[in-house]
């Protein structure tokens, strides 16, 4: 399908038609339409910086993980684009049942509102991860492997981080011991896969840990954990007020760390049907005041209770086959 043939409006209206239908209702899309979304959005990602500089007001959302019905609930709550500006922090695919609808609506909105709708890369927007955790299988079942590869080409061009009004630093995972200057992020060339170590890996994989000073080993077997001291030093050095990241299930949909200098957002309520967590969305107004909108979990009791940010971290098992042993 030639670029001009992609009818984004038609696709968006079809994707929104399932509002109010039974959760999980499949949206009919052609392979040509989905491929067109990937190609056009990839062009837009490459035309915009890898480190986005954004202005408030906007709403920031964490992991969605294919929970399409919950994504629609978020938009119902916060306003469907272009009613509000949005920044999503990655992890659109895998685990949930409707990764295709989820990523297609997000890419369609990116194409329709390129200056008001922004998507960062999460660790699941990476072929070696989404090959395993569900997206590949969903693409293969509903379309074909070639289309999954087209998504990979698109994901390899997503921006990595954003700064809101020079004060709020946003990324999917967290900080990196290699990050001294924002220029280092700007120098990352796209398209790129996510390496196993280094700056890009850390921005997508690292986690805060209240029991760590400085840098620690990460139970995921990838990247590091970092303490409150690292957060404070980073904010001071770059004259920032807040780090906003996702990547971990948190019970209330949002959770502060390091005396409110960092916030974790997670926007998939009842994650995987196994957690009793709420989903959170952060609204940043023109004065940079942050407030939180919460999607409550459904009433049914989850299989497991979840005790907070540092209890377990089930979000993604180790990336390597043999993670480094804890010393």
Swiss-Prot record:
Record's cofactor remark: Binds 2 manganese ions per subunit.
Q: Which GO terms describe its cellular component?
A: cytoplasm; nucleus; PTW/PP1 phosphatase complex
What molecular functions are annotated in GO for this chain?
A: metal ion binding; myosin-light-chain-phosphatase activity; protein serine/threonine phosphatase activity
User: In which residues is Mn(2+) 1 bound?
Assistant: 63, 65, 91
Residues where Mn(2+) 2 binds: 91, 123, 172, 247
Catalytic residues per the record? 124 (proton donor)
Q: Which domain of life is it from?
A: Eukaryota
User: What cofactor does its activity depend on?
Assistant: Mn(2+)
Keyword vocabulary terms for this entry: Acetylation, Carbohydrate metabolism, Cell cycle, Cell division, Cytoplasm, Glycogen metabolism, Hydrolase, Manganese, Metal-binding, Nucleus, Protein phosphatase
Q: What's a Pfam family this protein contains? A: STPPase_N
Catalytic reaction equation(s): O-phospho-L-seryl-[protein] + H2O = L-seryl-[protein] + phosphate; O-phospho-L-threonyl-[protein] + H2O = L-threonyl-[protein] + phosphate
Kindly report the protein's main subcellular placement as a broad class: cytoplasm
Residues bearing N-acetylalanine are 2
The biological process GO terms on file are: cell division; circadian regulation of gene expression; glycogen metabolic process; regulation of cell adhesion; regulation of circadian rhythm
For the region Disordered, what residue ranges are annotated?
305-327
Q: What does this protein do?
A: Protein phosphatase that associates with over 200 regulatory proteins to form highly specific holoenzymes which dephosphorylate hundreds of biological targets. Protein phosphatase (PP1) is essential for cell division, it participates in the regulation of glycogen metabolism, muscle contractility and protein synthesis. Involved in regulation of ionic conductances and long-term synaptic plasticity.
> By what name is this protein known?
Serine/threonine-protein phosphatase PP1-beta catalytic subunit
Gene field: ppp1cb
């Amino acid at each position: 399908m030639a670029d001009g043939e992609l009818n984004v409006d038609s696709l968006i209206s079809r994707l929104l038609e399932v509002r109010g239908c039974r959760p999980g209702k499949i949206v009919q899309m052609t392979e040509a339409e989905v491929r067109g979304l990937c190609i056009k959005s990839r062009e837009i990602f490459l035309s915009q910086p890898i480190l986005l500089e954004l202005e408030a007001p906007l709403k920031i959302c964490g992991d969605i993980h294919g929970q399409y019905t919950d994504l629609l609930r978020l938009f119902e709550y916060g306003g469907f684009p272009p009613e509000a500006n949005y920044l999503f922090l990655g992890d659109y695919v895998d685990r949930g049942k409707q990764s295709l609808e989820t990523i297609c609506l997000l890419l369609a909105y990116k194409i329709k509102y390129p200056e008001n709708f922004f998507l960062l890369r999460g660790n699941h927007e990476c072929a070696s991860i989404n090959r395993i955790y569900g997206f590949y299988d969903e693409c293969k079942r509903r379309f074909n492997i070639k289309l999954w590869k087209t998504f990979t080409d698109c994901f390899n061009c997503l921006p990595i981080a954003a700064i809101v009004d020079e004060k709020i630093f946003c990324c999917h995972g967290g900080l990196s011991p290699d990050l001294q200057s924002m220029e280092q992020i700007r120098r990352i060339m796209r398209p790129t896969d996510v390496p196993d170590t280094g700056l890009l890996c850390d921005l997508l994989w690292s986690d805060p840990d209240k029991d760590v000073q400085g840098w620690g080993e990460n139970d995921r077997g990838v990247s590091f954990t970092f303490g409150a001291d690292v957060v404070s030093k980073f904010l001071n050095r770059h004259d920032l007020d807040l780090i906003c990241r996702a990547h971990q299930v948190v019970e209330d949909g949002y959770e502060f760390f390091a005396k409110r200098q960092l916030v974790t957002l997670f926007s998939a309520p009842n994650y995987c049907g196994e957690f009793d967590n709420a989903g959170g969305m952060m609204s940043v107004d023109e004065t940079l005041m942050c407030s939180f909108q919460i999607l409550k979990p459904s009433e049914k009791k989850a299989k497991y209770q979840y005790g907070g940010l540092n209890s377990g971290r089930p979000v993604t098992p180790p990336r390597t086959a043999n993670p480094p042993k804890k010393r």
